[in-house]
């Protein structure tokens, strides 16, 4: 009788323990599943929420404007593609016009590529020198690649993913409003060596086309001539052009 009672107690204890483990496992699985689903929903909702309240321009990149903030929506198909930045003067004050700087003058060109990094949740921007190239499969191709690497000039946090993950949203204000010089280094390029006053500068507008993006900006600085400080505001146009997948034949 005592042995039977002991066996019954052991069996009941084992049953309770098994039930507890099963409940804990199930709770943990549902918790992980819930977190995963919440994460996806949050990401999708952020994209949908942002696009819903934005003024959108269709083109090479979709441009979304939310009040004073500007976003590029970059498709995966455009990651790692060759792009050319062309910066031109669109309007100058008297002092610079008198010194020979006129509307229409180009002052900075740059080749860039966008690279999506889902591990660090960033989009990197690199530049390189096109004068150094080698045919793919050539015996020295690897050596050339190692000795003439692309340089990173900018990074953008990924603000949101498109629901099917085929595109990302990045906020691009900083490279056009004078905060950073990576896309538009106006005053160094025209040999003034001055810094942009961000609080007195702004993005004038953006337009999207099938093969390019156009950005207008008003960049202000202040230079000192003798005892006099002179404020200067220059209107610039930045054109980001999609280059052919097969590089064009060089002239030389």
Model-inferred region functions:
Residues 1-10:
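Bacterial N-terminal signal peptides that target proteins for export
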Residues 10-19:
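Bacterial N-terminal signal peptides
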Residues 20-26:
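Sec/Tat signal peptide C-region and signal peptidase I cleavage site
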Residues 27-252:
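Auxiliary tRNA-acceptor-end handling modules of aminoacyl-tRNA synthetases
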């Amino acid at each position: 009788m005592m042995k039977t009672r002991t066996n019954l107690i052991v069996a009941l204890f084992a049953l309770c323990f098994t039930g507890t483990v099963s409940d804990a496992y199930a709770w943990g699985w549902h918790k992980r599943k819930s977190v995963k689903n919440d994460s996806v929903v949050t990401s999708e909702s952020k994209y949908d929420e942002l696009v819903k309240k934005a003024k959108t321009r269709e083109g090479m990149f979709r441009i979304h404007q939310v009040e004073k903030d500007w976003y590029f929506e970059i498709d995966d198909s455009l990651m790692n593609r060759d792009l050319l930045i062309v910066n031109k003067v669109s309007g100058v004050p008297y002092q610079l016009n008198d010194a020979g700087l006129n509307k229409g003058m180009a002052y900075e060109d740059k080749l860039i590529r966008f690279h999506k990094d889902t591990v660090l949740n960033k989009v990197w921007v690199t530049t390189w020198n096109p004068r150094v190239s080698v045919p793919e499969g050539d015996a020295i191709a690897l050596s050339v690649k190692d000795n003439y690497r692309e340089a990173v000039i900018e990074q953008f946090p990924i603000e949101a993913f498109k629901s099917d993950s085929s595109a990302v949203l990045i906020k691009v204000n900083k490279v056009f409003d004078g905060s950073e010089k990576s896309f538009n280094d106006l005053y160094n390029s025209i040999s003034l060596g001055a810094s942009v006053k961000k609080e007195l500068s702004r993005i004038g507008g953006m337009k999207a086309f099938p093969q390019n993006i156009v950005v207008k900006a008003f960049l202000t600085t202040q230079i000192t001539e003798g005892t006099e400080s002179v404020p200067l505001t220059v209107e610039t146009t930045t054109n980001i052009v999609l280059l052919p997948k097969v590089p064009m034949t060089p002239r030389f």
